[in-house]
Amino acid sequence: MVTRRHLLASASLSATLAALGITPEALAASRVKLGNAAPFNFDALIERARAMAGQPYTPPATAPADILAKIDYEAHGKIKFDTAHALFADGPGQFPVTFFHLGTFFRAPVRMHVVDKGEAREIVYDESYFDMPADSPARKLPRNSGFAGFRFQESRLGDQKKLDWKKNDWVAFLGASYFRAIGELYQYGLSARGIALDVAQAGRAEEFPNFTHVWFDTPSNEHADSVTIYALLDGPGITGAYRFVMHRGKGVVMEIDTALFLRRDIDRFGIAPASSMYWFSETAKGTATDWRPEVHDSDGLAMWTGSGERIWRPLNDPPRVMTSAFSDNNPRGFGLLQRDRDFNNYMDGVHYERRPSLWVEPLEGWGEGAVQLVEIPTDDEIHDNIVAMWVPKAPARAGSHYRLRYRLHWLADEPYPTPLARCVATRLGNGGQPGQPRPRGVRKFMVEFKGGPLEKVPFGVKPEAVLTSSRGTFSYVFTEAVPNGVPGHWRAQFDLTVDGKEPVDMRLFLRLDGKPLSETWLYQYHPFQSPVGPVAS
């Protein structure tokens, strides 16, 4: 028997639908239930967000709280979306859409819509879209309760034996304005979100506005590698309209166009925020903290400044909440990266070595401001304790509006690698000399750089370590080739003597004949006492 699926696979979608007399809208309706049609375009969505900002915030209606409370972690894990109801499972386009169910951890409903030829129809929630146990509390939810989020699945047109679209997805939106994508190594890791409001701001509770509505543009090209969605953001302090054009190729690249409107003053207005996890790495690890050598989704913040400087700032698990601001004017880009790709440095089946890097690329001038890095103490890998974002210099006041365009690159590395040598490791140890009593308050640093111009340093010539700090004094400063036989692999070594426990900010790069050979290493050192001896009195 020839099914519609067979027909769609053997001919172009437009020809098949025409032959069957089925519109794309009707095709979507065969998989999910749709509401009435209403006009839709991005300009109108922007005006809707603008009008909402002039009105008091109204929290979205949610499903009964007592039912949602029963859909706990265990119950939610037993609810699986039935891919027989996936949006665009038969096309048009190559990437079907599946949905997340509401639960105790995801209570705010997201209204989903499909757009075709300028008309939008809501996708009506129905429990029949999900496989769930007969006694699941989710069966007691009222009709049209909404969804918690959605995923784009891998291509239905690809080799299903290698990458079954029903089991593999490449982007997910779930919770508040959070979303994430896999990189080119097919692994989820850190997250992005639409906006960050008052992160770790003294005297202010952080606000988490929600994407309350999402619209899926019906693809017009059967084999296009991109999808387009629109989203409405709403919260007590902000409204916004978003357009995401998401490309699935080498990793995932998202082009984001957003209009934002403020209901109130925002003390820390975080644009293009990324959230990640860093517990420990080769840099510093407490005795017997964990059996694994390293645990992190990202190991550093990379920045490409408006003046062209390339900067690498290794991440910390600090003793207290720390916020670092790196002032800039029209930054070229920044991102939280996972540079260490060696499994042996993690030894974990969750494959931290495959976690994606996320690079933010402004598509227009962002003016004066700062890349801000928030580091929060953690004692486990289950917490996202790192936030990186752009914060404008001008105050974010009630009534202000912003129009922003930027690109997010979810890749294994930076999309525009520096030609300079890159920092590949930061190692800390006891200061002083082997075999001698170790002086108090002295820490030894070993910073490794690799590649770029270092590969052409003549034999017998040593680069200069250009080193500064906010306080303390340096000693035993020198550079040497790492004795591993790898060309262009060098390290700078030095001791830092410092009193007290206040953080020390350091800056280092390698130079030869007045020219930089490496990117700039920035580091914030939190003095600590090593649990080893002997220590000089």
Curated annotation (Swiss-Prot):
GO terms for molecular function: carbohydrate binding; catalytic activity. GO terms for biological process: beta-glucan biosynthetic process. Keywords: Periplasm, Plasmid, Signal. It is found in: Periplasm. Its main location: periplasm. Belongs to the OpgD/OpgG family. This is Glucans biosynthesis protein D 2.
